[in-house]
C-alpha cells in the first residue's frame, strides 16, 4: 500500500497536536462547560465546515420589558430563550431537532419585538456567546440583532447536521467509509436549507440593523461572511452531486464537466465575498483556508474534465490543450493538499476526512491521466510549443439555489385584546420603576 507525502505530513501534524492535547490533559488546563462538566478534548473531523456556533447568554428580559407587554408574553420569551441556551450548552449543539423546534417557537414570539408599532426594538440588551469556549462575544440592545442571531444559529445547526450525515459512524467490511446515496441527497437538501437561512439574513435582516450597531456585532455576522457561507454550502452540495454523477453510469462527460465548472464558480464567488471581510478574530482565517482548499480542488476538477472533453477532438491542438489541462489539474491538486493541511492546523485544529466522493476519484485519476497523456502526446508538445497555453474554462449557469425561507407567523399573544385588560404600564412609569429598583439594589 503506497503512502503519499501528503498523508505522512498530515500524520506528523496530527501526532504533534495529539501530544499537545496529552500534555494539556496531564496538567491543570481543562475546558469546562458553564455547568461544571468537563469538556472532552478531541480533534473533530470536518466535511461540511461551519464557523463556531453562537448561543444565547443570560439576559434580563423580565426587567427590560416589565409593564410594557403582558407578563405571559415576557415569560414565554424568557422560557424559550433560556431553554435554547441550556440545551445548546449542555449538549454542545448536538440536540439539533430539539434546538430547531425551540428556535422556531422563539422566533414566533420574538418577531413582536421588531414591530415599530410596539416601540420595543431597542429596549432589551441581548447577549450571545461562543459555544466552544463560553466567551461572551456580543451584547447588543436591538431586537433585529437577536433575530439575526437566531436565524444564524439555525443555519449553523443545519450545516452541523449535514456534516454529521457525511461522517458515518460505521465502516463497510472492506474497511472503507461508506455514505449511502440517500444520505448524500439528504445532505444536499440540508445544505440548500442552510444557504436559504443565510441568504435571508443578508437580504432581509441585516438591512434593518443600524450601521453603528453592526460595528459592535461579532465578525461572524458580517454580510460578506454570511454570503460566503451561503455560497459555500451550495458549492458543497454541487460537490456531492458531482460525486453521485461519477458513480452513475448514465452521467455523461459533459454533465461531469458542467458540475465541476459550477463547483469552481461557487467557490470563486465565496472567496470574493470573504476576502473583503475582517477575519482577525475567531474562525475567520480557518474559514478562508477552507475556501482556498475547496477552490483549488474545484479548479483541478474543472480542468481535468475540460481536458477529457478536449481530448475527444481529432486535431493536434485539441490534444495539446487537453494535456495542458491535465498538467494544470495535477499542480492544483498538489496545492490543494497544502491548503488542506493549513486549514486543519488553523485554530481550532481539526482533522481532514478520508478522501471521499468526487475528490477520492480525482486524486486517483488526475495524476494517472496527466502522466499517461503527457507521455502519449509528448512529441506534439515539443513540436508545438507555441500552443502550450491553458485554455479558458467554459461558463455555465449555476444549478443550485438556496431554499426560500420565511419567518414563522407572529405569535397570537401579540394580537390579543388582553393588553388593556392587564393594564399595560406606560413607558415613563416603567423607567421610573427601573430607577427605583437600581436604587434599592
Provide a role label for each language-model segment.
Residues 198-200, 204-205, 258-278, 329, ...:
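Long, amphipathic alpha-helical regulatory blocks in the mid-to-C-terminal portion
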Residues 1-24:
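Intrinsically disordered, low-complexity basic segments at termini and long loops, enriched
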Residues 148-167, 225-243, 298-305:
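Amphipathic alpha-helical repeat scaffolds of TPR domains
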Residues 120-157, 200-208:
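Extended ligand-binding groove/face enriched in aromatic
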Residues 22-140, 170, 220, 248-255, ...:
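Eukaryotic intrinsically disordered, low-complexity segments enriched for acidic and Ser/Thr/Pro residues
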Residues 79, 98, 105, 154, ...:
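Acidic, Ser/Thr-rich intrinsically disordered and amphipathic helical segments
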Residues 133, 140, 160-193, 197-220, ...:
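Short coil/linker segments at helix-helix boundaries
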Residues 112, 160, 200-203, 240, ...:
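Positions within ordered alpha-helical repeat solenoids
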Amino acid at each position: 500500500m503506497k503512502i503519499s507525502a501528503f498523508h505522512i505530513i498530515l500524520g506528523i501534524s496530527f501526532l504533534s497536536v495529539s501530544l499537545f492535547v496529552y500534555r494539556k490533559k496531564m496538567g491543570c488546563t481543562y475546558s469546562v462547560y458553564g455547568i461544571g462538566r468537563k469538556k472532552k478534548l478531541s480533534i473533530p473531523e470536518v466535511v461540511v465546515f461551519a464557523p463556531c456556533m453562537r448561543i444565547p447568554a443570560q439576559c434580563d428580559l423580565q426587567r427590560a420589558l416589565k409593564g410594557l407587554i403582558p407578563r405571559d408574553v415576557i415569560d414565554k420569551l424568557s422560557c424559550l430563550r433560556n431553554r435554547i441556551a441550556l440545551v445548546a450548552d449542555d449538549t454542545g449543539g448536538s440536540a439539533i431537532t430539539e434546538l430547531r423546534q425551540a428556535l422556531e417557537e422563539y422566533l414566533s414570539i420574538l418577531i413582536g419585538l421588531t414591530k415599530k408599532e410596539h416601540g420595543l426594538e431597542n429596549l432589551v440588551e441581548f447577549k450571545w456567546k461562543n459555544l466552544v469556549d463560553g466567551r461572551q462575544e456580543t451584547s447588543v440592545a436591538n431586537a433585529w440583532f437577536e433575530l439575526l442571531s437566531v436565524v444564524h444559529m439555525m443555519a449553523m445547526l443545519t450545516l452541523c447536521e449535514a456534516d454529521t450525515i457525511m461522517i458515518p459512524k460505521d465502516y463497510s467490511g472492506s474497511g472503507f467509509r461508506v455514505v449511502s446515496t440517500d444520505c448524500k441527497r439528504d445532505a444536499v437538501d440540508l445544505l440548500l436549507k442552510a444557504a436559504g437561512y443565510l441568504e435571508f439574513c443578508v437580504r432581509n435582516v441585516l438591512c434593518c440593523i443600524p450601521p453603528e450597531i453592526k460595528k459592535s456585532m461579532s465578525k461572524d455576522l458580517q454580510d460578506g461572511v454570511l454570503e460566503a457561507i451561503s455560497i459555500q454550502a451550495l458549492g458543497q452540495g454541487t460537490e456531492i452531486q458531482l460525486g453521485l454523477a461519477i458513480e452513475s453510469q448514465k452521467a455523461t462527460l459533459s454533465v461531469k464537466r458542467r458540475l465541476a465548472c459550477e463547483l469552481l464558480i461557487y467557490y470563486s464567488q465565496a472567496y470574493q465575498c470573504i476576502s473583503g471581510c475582517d477575519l482577525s478574530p475567531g474562525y475567520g482565517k480557518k474559514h478562508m483556508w477552507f475556501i482556498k482548499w475547496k477552490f483549488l480542488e474545484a479548479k483541478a476538477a474543472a480542468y481535468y474534465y475540460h481536458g477529457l472533453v478536449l481530448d475527444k477532438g481529432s486535431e493536434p491542438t485539441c490534444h495539446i490543450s487537453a494535456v495542458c489541462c491535465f498538467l494544470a489539474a495535477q499542480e492544483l491538486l498538489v496545492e490543494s493538499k497544502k491548503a488542506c493541511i493549513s486549514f486543519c492546523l488553523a485554530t481550532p485544529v481539526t482533522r481532514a476526512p478520508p478522501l471521499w466522493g468526487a475528490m477520492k476519484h480525482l486524486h486517483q485519476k488526475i495524476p494517472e491521466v496527466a502522466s499517461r497523456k503527457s507521455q502519449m502526446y509528448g512529441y506534439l508538445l515539443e513540436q508545438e510549443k507555441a500552443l502550450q497555453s491553458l485554455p479558458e474554462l467554459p461558463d455555465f449557469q449555476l444549478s443550485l439555489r438556496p431554499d426560500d425561507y420565511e419567518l414563522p407567523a407572529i405569535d397570537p399573544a401579540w394580537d390579543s385584546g388582553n393588553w388593556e385588560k392587564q393594564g399595560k404600564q406606560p413607558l415613563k412609569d416603567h423607567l421610573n420603576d427601573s430607577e427605583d429598583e437600581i436604587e434599592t439594589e
